[in-house]
Structures are given as structure tokens and as C-alpha cells.
Amino acid sequence: VQPRVVFVEPAAMTAWSNVDRSSLTELRAVIATEGHDIAGAITLTESLMHAPVPILNMSPTEVAVFIFTSGTAGSPKAAMLTHNNLHSNLVQISQENVLRNSDVVYGVLPLFHIFGLNVVLGYTLFVGATVVLVQRFDPSTALETFAERGVTVVPGAPQVWSALAQMPDDECKVLSQLR
């Protein structure tokens, strides 16, 4: 499997600089998520200004992503999920009507886990809602983001809610806008 596009965030720039790109024969673009510090890369904003890429007619049984398991029963393994696997999961989730297209979802869960990728990002886009992606959780910054961006839904691990519960009451008024 060869990547065609690679997204590189600031925290991964050192790792990316050590990759032997001569072996990436299918690579067509490197997109820097912030700044323009990577030779030959374009910014995420620049990538969105290009003409739309034609939609490919993919087989539902083709592998769409490799998601690594947590490794609780040994070493992490690459689970191959097809386009149909991902789409079926989105359809199943949408039957619960959890999100509305007017929602703004706080996306702090990692996208290299299936919940972050397909529930937080995928389902949000599937219903036409907005997702605010952040790299790291900080309770003070999160509360500011909730207020500034009008966040209405926060999928999060127990540690997120525990940290928010420790914040002073006067800073937590914005939590009343969450559903």
C-alpha cells in the first residue's frame, strides 16, 4: 500500500524528515497542516483552493484504511477496514440521530483511533455538522474554544470530563451550551 497524500502536523515534522521518500512512488502531495516549513509541501489552506478532485468510483470491498488495534492482547495489529465497513458504521450511528447538521463538535480524540476517525470526524461530516479539530486537550483552552466556536457536542474520554469538572465554576458557564 502506497500513500498518495501525506498530512504532516508540526509534531510529526521531525519524523517526516527522516522518511525515505524515494520509496513512496505513489506520493502526489505533502500537506503541512500548519505553516509552510516542509520543503515541497503545500499548506492545508492551499490544498483546499485547488480545483476539486474527481470523485473516484471505489468498490465497497476495497480497503479504505488501516487502523491499528490497541495491542491489549499483544502487539498492535493493522485492522483493514473497507469503504463498506466505514460507511455501514456511519449509517448505524446516524440512526440514533445524535448529531444535527447545526452542531459544532469538539474533536480532541485522536484520528488514528477508529472512534476519533469515524465517529468524531466521519459522522460529523456525514450529517453535515462542523468539527473543530484540536491536537491536545487543555481544559482552559477547551472552554475558550467552546465559547469562541459555539461547540455543542464534546465526545471525550473520562479524563476530559474529570479535568473540566475541576475548573472554577465561573469559567464553566459555557458548558451550558453543550447538549
Q: What is the predicted role of each segment?
A:
Residues V1-A15, K77-M80, G107, A129-R136:
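Short beta-strand->loop structural element characteristic of the AMP-binding/adenylate-forming
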Residues V1-E46, S176:
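Structural core segment of the AMP-binding/adenylate-forming
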Residues V6, V63, T69-T72, V105, ...:
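Conserved S/T- and glycine-rich ATP-binding loop of Class I adenylate-forming
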Residues V8-N18, F137-D138, V151-R179:
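Adenylate-forming
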Residues H50-F68, S75, V98-V104:
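Conserved pre-ATP/AMP-binding loop-to-beta segment of ANL
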Residues I55, I67, S140-L143, D170-C172:
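Short hydrophobic/charged patches on amphipathic alpha-helices used for structural packing
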Residues A64-S88:
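Conserved AMP-binding A3 loop
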Residues H87-V104, I114-V153, S162-A163, M167-P168:
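Conserved AMP-binding/adenylation subdomain of ANL enzymes
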